[in-house]
Amino acid sequence: MTNLRKSHPILKIINSSLVDLPVPVSISSWWNFGSLLMACLAVQILTGLFLAMHYTSDTATAFNSVTHICRDVNYGWIIRYLHANGASMFFICLYLHIGRGLYYGSYLYSETWNIGILLLFATMATAFMGYVLPWGQMSFWGATVITNLLSAIPYVGTDLVQWIWGGFSVDKATLTRFFAFHFLLPFIIAALAMVHLLFLHETGSNNPTGIPSDTDMIPFHPYHTIKDILGLMLMLSVLSALVLFSPDLLGDPDNYTPANPLNTPPHIKPEWYFLFAYAILRSIPNKLGGVLALVLSILILAVIPFLHTSKQRSMMFRPLSQCLFWILTSDLLILTWIGGQPVEHPYIIIGQVASIMYFTIILIIMPLTSLLENHLLKW
């Protein structure tokens, strides 16, 4: 008699994805982040569901409902801070996952990579709308500034912004629709993640060497389940420490002030995980140019597979490309720092140089370096 997990219509799908899936023997802990992201999404959906039971999406009561959750609901404070800091963990895992893909050449699985880019955009949209919901000062002004960027689109821009706002300013209609979309999008993200996984299992996982490993595979369970559980424990430890010891470390104090349309905060800035893109946006003096640069800073990921000029897939044996990769990482950290600083000298020029560096490294220097490495290896 065949094993039930191999014959049952539903169980065999789970079995082929999580139990008997052949996985390269050489993959390292950098391959843990997919499962960590699914864990983050599960935490976010669960905590979000419990928060939605007590939250009211009305401008008059939204701020007070969040206060009520933290003060009066049993363990409301921990649910709220798990949700807020869970988003930060989500983006840390997301950026490390993308970095891994860039370093080891996983972007050559184009369908998986493109679905991943869609997932990134969906996650960013969800996080942005979630930041608006507590209806603090930074929520209101962040929503006003970021949605207003769409007015840079020629001809239809102003109408588009008013259509999104549901009026002539960010108000009750905006908050209600943002809550609706913020609730809906995580389920779309979960569906996209399934498609992401489906395409990945069509090709099989990449590995650190970048060399096909069809002859050297091991089953996912128990080897990688144990490895993933270790990563999960480490991530949950960090998240717990963040939530229990300094829950407001990554937040903005301005968001503890109720939204006031008549009083602009001194420095309007998004959450830390958007600061690199915000710095690129601010580094261009022209509004439309800034918006284009902002979108392209993420959309540039879609171009990377076409810029792969190396004869080797992974950067594991390419020291010059490795140096460039870590320069790019440092550049992104500099942009993140600049995004949180006021618009004044010397931050303006540092932001502009870092923005130019970001696009130049990806579009010009990396492909040329790969060609040089091919030449040095006489390929």
Curated annotation (Swiss-Prot):
TM helices/strands, residue ranges: 33-53, 77-98, 113-133, 178-198, 226-246, 288-308, 320-340, 347-367
Location, primary (coarse class): mitochondrion
Protein topology in the membrane: Multi-pass membrane protein
Function: Component of the ubiquinol-cytochrome c reductase complex (complex III or cytochrome b-c1 complex) that is part of the mitochondrial respiratory chain. The b-c1 complex mediates electron transfer from ubiquinol to cytochrome c. Contributes to the generation of a proton gradient across the mitochondrial membrane that is then used for ATP synthesis.
Gene name of the encoded protein: MT-CYB
Sorted UniProt keywords: Electron transport, Heme, Iron, Membrane, Metal-binding, Mitochondrion, Mitochondrion inner membrane, Respiratory chain, Transmembrane, Transmembrane helix, Transport, Ubiquinone
Annotated positions binding heme b b562: H83, H182
Single Gene Ontology BP annotation: mitochondrial electron transport, ubiquinol to cytochrome c
Subunit-level organization: The cytochrome bc1 complex contains 11 subunits: 3 respiratory subunits (MT-CYB, CYC1 and UQCRFS1), 2 core proteins (UQCRC1 and UQCRC2) and 6 low-molecular weight proteins (UQCRH/QCR6, UQCRB/QCR7, UQCRQ/QCR8, UQCR10/QCR9, UQCR11/QCR10 and a cleavage product of UQCRFS1). This cytochrome bc1 complex then forms a dimer.
Entry protein name: Cytochrome b
InterPro entries: Cyt_b/b6_C, Cyt_b/b6_C_sf, Cyt_b/b6_N, Cytb/b6-like_sf, Cytochrome_b, Cytochrome_b_C_euk/bac, Cytochrome_b_N_euk/bac, Di-haem_cyt_TM
